[in-house]
């Protein structure tokens, strides 16, 4: 299980779990500022790292992101540990995309999260504007905020 770092009060009415993007860790200046901003507004923020980023933290070697199945399984493990009650999931770029995908899966299983927030959604791979990554968003009923 990946380590989860919490900011904000345990008694908060809402927890926002955030995953990092493909190239920067959970404690990048962007992620720190976002988590601190949520905590300052009385919300609880939970951050974690996908396995490839945790390995990079251990040995300093840059790696590509894990396959989507590993990223989605990591998200599910984090959600199971935190609990779905009053939980919004999201993240930066790739982390938000994976959150939206797992939210769609959970919704279809009848165990949805409260919402999704994507901070810079990667609508298509770099240099491939014709290859959209949005099919699951077309039917997603979970409240979703995408900030570009």
What are these regions (language model features)?
Residues 98-102, 127:
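Hydrolases whose catalytic domains are alpha/beta-hydrolase-1, hotdog thioesterase
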Residues 110-123:
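A conserved short beta-strand
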């Amino acid at each position: 299980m990946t380590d989860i770092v919490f900011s904000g009060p345990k008694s908060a009415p809402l927890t926002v779990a955030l995953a990092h993007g493909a190239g920067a860790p959970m404690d990048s200046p962007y992620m720190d500022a976002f988590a601190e901003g949520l905590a300052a507004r009385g919300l609880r923020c939970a951050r974690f790292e996908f396995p490839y980023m945790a390995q990079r933290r251990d040995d300093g070697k840059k790696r590509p992101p894990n396959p989507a199945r590993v990223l989605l399984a990591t998200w599910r493990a984090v959600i199971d540990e935190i609990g779905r009650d009053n939980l919004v999931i999201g993240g930066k770029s790739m982390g938000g995309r994976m959150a939206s995908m797992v939210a769609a899966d959970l919704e279809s299983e009848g165990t949805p999260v409260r919402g999704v927030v994507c901070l810079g959604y990667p609508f298509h791979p770099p240099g491939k504007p014709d290859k959209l990554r949005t099919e699951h968003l077309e039917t997603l009923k979970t409240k979703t905020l995408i900030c570009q």
